[in-house]
């Protein structure tokens, strides 16, 4: 929002017109005077924002977008993951005082991207890790799956400290800990078909015949809602939502116990975002997954996570049940982060709020 506030200020100072391209209708309500809806290369609707929100869209597709954006998520109930049986079990994942630093060569300074973070996740629990860009969320996730080495601390998975393990020692656990990456198009090999991409992780598991492997791939496509006709498609032939689903299918192919979802709803339009949220929630229920959701999408957090942890400058500043954090955050930064979610309502239209500029101060 700081960037948008600055954009509005400069546009006013210089007398500029601005075209804002976005999926976020809250952003449209707060910053725009008119809204245009595009579909399949065509401009299907153009209206003043206040009329669009008050009188409603004239096109069915536009109405679907607005309705999807206004749906209040069904909160996850922390009690589901907090029953006596689960509370008596040791955590599936326990992180203690984790530290990861990076050296900036240009000025020889050291950045503590993850700075003494401790958290735990039990079986069947889902934790959302939120915070602004650069807070250390993705670095944290990469440390958990050993994509990058940690400097110090402890990462215990199923009772084993994975931090000192070599790649070979960690390999047997890699099947049980999977990650869905933020940018699926970058993570997916462009020369492989969907069939090949989903089949590749199966090599980490028990040996399978070609027939069993082919059947498992189709089963996974069904599970994540991808048409079997797309099995021979390449990543560039898929929509962003379909690419996300392929990434999820790859992660689930080896039947993991724990999955890290890095920005699972980023860069998706409102309808597809809702579909991905529903898919992930259904998969959690069906498979009993433990999960870490790394996200900026606070609206989706309420549907996806039992608990929320807030990161800032590499540190964990607040942690608790999702509804308690949303209804009564204890930390000032958390309150500002929640306030930065833009409502889809008429009063914000065209008024160009600038109260969010203080977020990083």
Predicted regions and their residues:
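ABC ATPase "signature
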Residues: 46-48, 316-320
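Conserved ABC transporter NBD signature motif
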Residues: 153-161, 173
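Short catalytic/signature loops enriched in Gly
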Residues: 49-96, 104-110, 322-361
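A short, proline-enriched helix->beta-strand linker immediately N-terminal to the Walker B motif
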Residues: 253-257
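Conserved ABC ATPase "signature" region
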Residues: 211-229, 339
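Conserved ABC ATPase signature
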Residues: 234-238, 242
